[in-house]
Design a protein with these regions (language model features):
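Active-site-proximal helix/loop microenvironment
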Residues: 236-245, 331-397
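Short, glycine/proline-biased beta-turn/loop segments that scaffold the active-site neighborhood
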Residues: 241-292, 298-301, 313, 324-328, ...
């Protein structure tokens, strides 16, 4: 090489890397052969657009590629404010131009992804700032059958959080994400229990048009809501005849009127209310002379009709139902919801059919789980699916807990235990310690809704199978799968 060439490839590359490290763009430009007019602006914009805080460069050894050309491989790392260290590598090419060693600059010298018109950009994207999780802080189980309820809750926590993506693209091609910082998400705990919710969901696998609601009686927290009801029905809001599960409330009214659980009553297959139609037991079964507790266990329609029309007025039944949540305001669960409703019976005939959960009596599956929880705890509490503060923010203050008649509640506990021990829920595969009440409700078109409500320790529940058949045939197997799966 001619001795008249100024400097060397090593000297020029070292000066270039030193200036680049310092951010001395103008000195860098003097070392480049025919730098583009926007050389300084291009470097500055690249750093500004990507929020580069600093750069570290590690040049390799100079490699000769000819008598008047050389190259220097290098690695580096840019620190981006959103991502931290972002490593890159490249090659600095040099050649003798005008008897001086110069840098042959190209866009890929700045960053290899800029070759062939490529671009690198920092993109912002929004994501939810809040994720609804179980009471334990875990993700809601997949296929939980609570998805529609969670989707309804999410707008109540509609804050957004910003995420960042570092993207590169070639002309005409889709951008590729190089690095991502997901939006920061805070966890909003629901009251749903992971294990209880999972058990409820799996119990409904393969079951159409059904729901399971589980509540913690001591607090009113909703532990599970698994809803496969069809036709946009909601287990929180829509009303259905509760059938014989309503006998829990009729029994409470009769107990408060003075009827003792041990009192002997008649349970004929059929009973005709004077000047009204005959009322029949399921399957027209007769149990003869039994205790009132066993009439409840056997779900004797005839007993309940006879005792209700002889001991209660329509107002008595309505007032008792009101104590148990019927006819009240919407429930401040965090998702709203209803309990039950009934019209004041107009005479003995309407009182008769209302007494076993037909006629004007309707309830939501949530309501009947609430009733079961009240038997276990002795207190009627409004269920909630969120923290007290969150539920109140969304729905307003919840009604205060109401303590129920201690004597009636104590008797109902024994009577619901008898249902499982030797009544309509006996030998159904339920785990030990379950108390409950079956229900079969007449529905349109001669069909039947199946119900089973109950509790075990500090867990109360309702199982509802719409148009599925009797409580024993449709709801009990689902309840057994649910409770055995917890």
């Amino acid at each position: 090489m001619s001795k008249r060439v100024k400097g060397s490839a090593a000297q020029t590359s070292a000066a270039y890397f030193t200036a680049w490290q310092r951010g001395d763009l103008r000195t860098m430009a003097t070392l480049v052969y025919q730098p583009p007019a926007d050389f300084v602006t291009r470097h500055r914009s690249f750093s500004d657009d990507l929020h580069v805080q600093d750069i570290q460069l590690r040049p390799g050894a100079v490699k000769s590629t000819g008598e008047t050309s050389a190259e220097v491989p290098f690695t580096g790392s840019r620190t981006l404010s959103e991502f931290g260290a972002w490593p890159f590598s490249g090659t600095l090419r040099l050649a003798v131009r005008d008897r001086t060693w110069k840098v042959l600059w190209a866009p890929e010298t700045l960053d290899p992804r800029l070759k062939d018109g490529g671009t690198v950009r920092l993109a912002e994207f929004d994501g939810p700032a809040v994720e609804l999780v179980t009471s334990e802080g875990d993700k809601i189980p997949n296929d939980s059958y609570a998805e529609s309820y969670l989707a309804e809750l999410k707008p109540e926590f509609d804050e957004v959080s910003q995420g960042w993506a570092l993207e590169s693209a070639l002309p005409g091609q889709q951008a590729r994400r190089l690095m991502t910082v997901e939006p920061k998400v805070s966890l909003e705990r629901t009251t749903l229990s992971r294990s209880v919710q999972a058990a409820a969901a799996r119990a409904l696998d393969g079951v159409r048009d059904a729901s399971i609601i589980a509540i913690r009686p001591s607090t009113g927290e909703v532990l599970a809501v698994a809803d496969r009801l069809e036709g946009n029905y909601s287990a929180f809001r829509d009303f259905f005849p509760p059938g014989s599960t309503f006998k829990t409330i009729t029994a409470a009214a009769l107990l408060e009127s003075g009827l003792d659980p041990a009192a002997e009553v008649d349970c004929p297959a059929t009973y005709t209310v004077p000047n009204f139609r005959p009322i029949k037991n399921a399957g027209e079964q007769a149990h003869g002379r039994v205790t009132f507790a066993d009439a409840f266990a056997y779900s004797c329609n005839t007993t309940f009709v006879r005792e209700a029309v002889s001991r209660l007025s329509g107002d008595d039944l309505v007032e008792t139902a009101a104590k148990w949540g019927f006819g009240g305001a919407k429930l401040a669960t965090g998702l709203g919801g209803n309990c039950g409703r009934m019209d004041p019976p107009d005479g003995t005939n309407e009182l008769a059919v209302d007494s076993f959960g037909q006629g004007s009596v309707e309830a939501t599956p949530l309501c009947m789980a609430m009733v079961a929880a009240a038997v276990e705890s002795g207190t009627l509490r409004v269920p909630r699916i969120l923290s007290k503060a969150a539920a109140e923010r969304i729905d307003g203050p919840a009604a205060k807990p109401v303590d129920l008649d201690e004597g009636a509640v104590a008797a109902l506990r024994e009577m619901m235990a008898a249902v499982v021990d030797h009544g309509t829920a006996a030998a159904a595969g339920l785990p030990a310690g379950v108390s409950g009440k079956t229900g079969t409700a007449e529905a349109a078109g001669g069909r039947e809704h199946g119900w089973f409500i109950g509790y075990r320790d500090d867990l109360a529940f309702s199982v509802f199978v719409r148009n599925g058949g009797s409580g024993r045939s449709a709801a009990l197997p689902v309840a057994a799968r649910f409770l055995n799966g917890i």
